[in-house]
């Protein structure tokens, strides 16, 4: 039996144990993981350094290296996230609804774990911690399959998690890592319907599209973040300038702006100043012919650029003559993640909210807030851009299903 199949079978067995664990037992395990991460920070960073060095040798971009890199503060941030997760209400066992039928049957809809969650993701070692702890909190066994670029970091983190779980009532195999990073292991994970209840891809568009296209296992799609901001002709200048920091504050994340859509009338007044401000921050602009006419240093955008999640300081710029044109462009090229409008015209804002198809829509605010903690709902395992079974930041309830519990006293159907 190969690694993937063996770990799938083990995860199915473990899932039946985890459903019996209390909230207190799960929280004790999370606390142990947080403590062990701090205790073994030096070991994790030593292994992460190997990934960074290999990445540099392979010519990884700065944005990819940033996603791959761990440091003491990022590990502290991970542990703080775990502590916040401990404080969140456990959804498992929650009664979603209850009613009584005329025949005396009492019916309850109860939250239960999904069972076995598969996570396939790219060069983000922090996802290893996020996925493991969120799954444990919700009583799910998890099989992790990261990328080859982060294999040293992922192996180290999972080893630390195992050492932590050994001190608790939760089985070490509640969290398992597929160490084979070849395409064959990924393809096998795609079709493990007998063992996986759901597969969650987290990464770039190519990875997500591949999983959605090839997996027979149910998929919770965490879409790429080709996010837009539309600056309407009525937009406040300073507000617009401030909100554009959604691109420059941390460009390598999925909720950063990738395309700036400018109303022509606003651009006539403030466009050149905006472009100059962005270039001072090291931004390389790619725009349409109208943008080029305003600033000759802008690179002409290709058709491919409009649909690209750059994950770097390279936004595209599109000039439009109406909100209808802006909405059409966003719905054509957007990834249904997060979209924003900056406007003082409430009628246009309402039209934007009704017409744009995305998980999160913003008025006069940055798209960078599409995040479980920023929404106030706590930890999330990704941002879903699909419409079933959940949309937007996927918090703890997203990793549960429901079942019906019916109590009677001898009723039969006649």
UniProtKB/Swiss-Prot annotation:
Pathway annotation from the record: Amino-acid biosynthesis; L-proline biosynthesis; L-glutamate 5-semialdehyde from L-glutamate: step 2/2
InterPro entries named among the record's database cross-references: Ald_DH/histidinol_DH, Ald_DH_C, Ald_DH_N, Aldehyde_DH_dom, G-glutamylP_reductase_CS, Glu-5-SA_DH, GPR_dom
Entry keyword Oxidoreductase: yes
Pfam families, per the entry: Aldedh
GO molecular function: glutamate-5-semialdehyde dehydrogenase activity; NADP binding
This enzyme's EC code(s): 1.2.1.41
Domain of life: Bacteria
Chemical reaction(s) catalysed: L-glutamate 5-semialdehyde + phosphate + NADP(+) = L-glutamyl 5-phosphate + NADPH + H(+)
Family: Belongs to the gamma-glutamyl phosphate reductase family.
NCBIfam families xrefs: PRK00197.1 (NF001221), proA (TIGR00407)
Protein name in the entry: Gamma-glutamyl phosphate reductase
Source organism per UniProt: Bacillus anthracis
Gene: proA
């Amino acid at each position: 039996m190969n690694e993937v199949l063996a770990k799938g079978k083990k995860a199915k067995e473990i899932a039946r144990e985890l459903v019996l664990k209390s909230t207190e037992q799960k929280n004790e395990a999370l606390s142990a993981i947080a403590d062990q991460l701090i205790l073994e920070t030096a070991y994790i960073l030593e292994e992460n350094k190997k990934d960074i060095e290999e990445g540099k040798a392979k010519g990884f971009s700065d944005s990819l290296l940033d996603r791959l890199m761990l440091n003491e503060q990022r590990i502290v941030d991970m542990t703080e996230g775990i502590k916040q997760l401990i404080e969140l209400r456990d959804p498992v066992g929650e009664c979603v609804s209850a009613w009584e039928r005329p025949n005396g049957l009492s019916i309850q809809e109860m939250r239960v774990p999904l069972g076995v969650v598969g996570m396939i993701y790219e060069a983000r070692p922090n996802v290893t911690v996020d996925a493991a702890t969120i799954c444990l909190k919700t009583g799910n066994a998890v099989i992790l399959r990261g990328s080859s670029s982060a294999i040293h970091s992922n192996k180290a983190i999972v080893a630390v998690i195992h050492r932590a779980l050994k001190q608790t009532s939760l089985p070490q195999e509640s969290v398992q890592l597929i160490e084979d990073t070849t395409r064959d292991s990924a393809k096998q994970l795609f079709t493990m319907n007998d063992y996986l209840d759901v597969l969650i891809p987290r990464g770039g568009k190519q990875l997500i599209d591949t999983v959605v296209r090839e997996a027979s296992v149910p998929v919770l799609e965490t879409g790429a973040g080709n996010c837009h901001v539309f600056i309407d002709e009525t937009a406040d200048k300073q507000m617009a300038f401030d909100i554009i920091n959604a691109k420059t504050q941390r460009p390598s994340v999925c909720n950063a702006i990738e395309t700036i859509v400018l109303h022509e009338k606003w651009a006539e007044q403030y466009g050149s100043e905006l472009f100059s401000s962005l270039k001072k921050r090291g931004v390389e602009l790619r725009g349409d012919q109208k943008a080029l006419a305003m600033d000759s240093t802008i690179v002409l955008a290709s058709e491919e650029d409009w649909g690209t999640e750059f994950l770097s300081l390279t936004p595209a710029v599109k000039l439009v003559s109406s909100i209808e044109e802006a909405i059409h462009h966003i719905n054509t090229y957007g990834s249904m993640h997060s979209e924003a409008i900056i406007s003082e015209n409430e009628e246009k804002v309402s039209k934007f909210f009704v017409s744009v198809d995305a998980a999160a829509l913003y008025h006069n605010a940055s798209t960078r807030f599409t995040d479980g903690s920023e929404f106030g709902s706590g930890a999330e395992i990704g941002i879903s851009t699909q419409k079933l079974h959940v949309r937007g930041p996927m918090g703890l309830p997203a990793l549960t299903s429901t079942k019906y519990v019916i109590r009677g006293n001898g009723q039969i159907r006649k």
